[in-house]
């Protein structure tokens, strides 16, 4: 095993028999208790019975079947549903490659799993808010049962990890693409031969991407799931030029919101994209995601940053003075097409959630707009 590293570093100890391109982080010891009642969230194939073998990362001793496992199986955490404690990752089939990015609660790496490209997310335990890290891990699994072209799919998950690592858990996800919508909007793609921003974000491309995102939201909302952190950085663009909503660390099930009467600290997200009712600490609804989509569409159209200034002042002005990004630019006022975009965006970020369109109506309007353009 490689030498363990401090919490602030991203390199990671990995079993020597892994096929590696570079060092990354593998999750932490023990099993993390869930703050949510999550027994319904994982499909059966991701949570085998307690008689199954440990899903801990393989380290030393070969067992009868020829696979490598920890010498002893860690005890199941008290309070965890029996099946949830046995997430299933075949670690011998994981080939870690390189880090794609990092955020407040962990890092994401590119890898292969059973020879297929995947992304591996590891949630750090060394953070300022351990409970928030735990919530982020379990929230990612809200979509474990879901399959949709515009949603990044969860492949497998585990809370069992080597003793020296700094991770609460590992989630293996479909590899949604090398580029985010944020990178496309602001011209910071990692593609070896990037197109110009203008070529990538023609009106037709904006509407195509918008429909991808709204299709994903419509599906999520039909499953009673709210994303609650929709923004360009959390939208991946695949090699097939399809947008996929990713990063569900702030997501919530509607029934959990109603039951727990979530207070503001239960809902994370990005203040520039948060609806006024979320900033006020009210219970979230699907219309909060529609608001975030409105800001995102404005970014695609203008290729500008939504706000400048201190976050607390922006948040106050959004709630108290109905502050929004400017719709006065020529892109919105110089043509009938621009005015149509202006109306769609304005409807999405209405102050009152009830006045915003639902995902189904928004999908219909965008399809009609796209069709009218030919």
UniProtKB/Swiss-Prot annotation:
InterPro entries xref list: Kinase-like_dom_sf (IPR011009), Prot_kinase_dom (IPR000719), Protein_kinase_ATP_BS (IPR017441), Ser/Thr_kinase_AS (IPR008271), Ser/Thr_Kinases-Pseudokinases (IPR051681)
Enzyme class: transferase
PROSITE patterns linked: PROTEIN_KINASE_ATP (PS00107), PROTEIN_KINASE_DOM (PS50011), PROTEIN_KINASE_ST (PS00108)
Protein kinase domain segment(s): 94-370
Binding site for ATP: 100-108, 121
This protein's UniProt keywords: ATP-binding, Kinase, Nucleotide-binding, Oncogene, Serine/threonine-protein kinase, Transferase
GO molecular function terms attached to this record: ATP binding; protein serine kinase activity; protein serine/threonine kinase activity
Keyword Transcription in annotation: no
EC number per UniProt: 2.7.11.1
Catalysed transformations (reactions): L-seryl-[protein] + ATP = O-phospho-L-seryl-[protein] + ADP + H(+); L-threonyl-[protein] + ATP = O-phospho-L-threonyl-[protein] + ADP + H(+)
Cleaved signal peptide residues: none
Catalytic residues (UniProt): 229
Family designation: Belongs to the protein kinase superfamily. Ser/Thr protein kinase family.
PANTHER family in UniProt: SERINE/THREONINE-PROTEIN KINASE TNNI3K-RELATED, V-MOS MOLONEY MURINE SARCOMA VIRAL ONCO HOMOLOG
Name of the molecule in the record: Serine/threonine-protein kinase-transforming protein mos
Native organism: Moloney murine sarcoma virus (strain HT-1)
């Amino acid at each position: 095993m490689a030498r363990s590293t401090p919490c602030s570093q991203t390199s990671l100890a990995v079993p020597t028999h892994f096929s590696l391109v570079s060092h990354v982080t593998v999750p932490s010891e023990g099993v993390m208790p869930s703050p949510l009642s999550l027994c319904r969230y994982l499909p059966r194939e991701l949570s085998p019975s307690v008689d199954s073998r440990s899903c801990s990362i393989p380290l030393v001793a070969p067992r009868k079947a020829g696979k490598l496992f920890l010498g002893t199986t860690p005890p199941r955490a008290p309070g965890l549903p029996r099946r949830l404690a046995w997430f299933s990752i075949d670690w011998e089939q994981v080939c870690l490659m390189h880090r794609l990015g990092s955020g407040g609660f962990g890092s994401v790496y590119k890898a292969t799993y059973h020879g297929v490209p995947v992304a591996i997310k590891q949630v750090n335990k060394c953070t300022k808010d351990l409970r928030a890290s735990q919530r982020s891990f379990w929230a990612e699994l809200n979509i474990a049962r879901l399959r949709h072209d515009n949603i990044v799919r969860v492949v497998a998950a585990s809370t069992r990890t080597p003793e020296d690592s700094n991770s609460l858990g590992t989630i293996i996800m479909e590899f949604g693409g090398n580029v985010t919508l944020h990178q496309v909007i602001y011209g910071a793609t990692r593609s070896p031969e990037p197109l110009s921003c203008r070529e990538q974000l023609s009106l037709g491309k904006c509407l195509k991407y918008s429909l991808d995102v709204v299709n994903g939201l419509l599906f999520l909302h039909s499953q009673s799931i709210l994303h609650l952190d929709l923004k360009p950085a959390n939208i991946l663009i695949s090699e097939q030029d399809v947008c996929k909503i990713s990063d569900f660390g702030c997501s919530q099930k509607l029934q959990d919101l109603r039951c727990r009467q979530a207070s503001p600290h239960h809902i994370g997200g990005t203040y520039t994209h948060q609806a006024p009712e979320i900033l006020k600490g009210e219970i979230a609804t699907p219309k909060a995601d529609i608001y975030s989509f409105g800001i995102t569409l404005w970014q695609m159209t203008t290729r500008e940053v939504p706000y400048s200034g201190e976050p607390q002042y922006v948040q106050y002005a959004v709630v108290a003075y109905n502050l929004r990004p400017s719709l006065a630019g020529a892109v919105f006022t110089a043509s009938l097409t621009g005015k149509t975009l202006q109306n769609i965006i304005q409807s999405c970020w209405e102050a009152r959630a009830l006045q915003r369109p639902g995902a189904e109506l928004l999908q219909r309007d965008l399809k009609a707009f796209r069709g009218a353009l030919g």
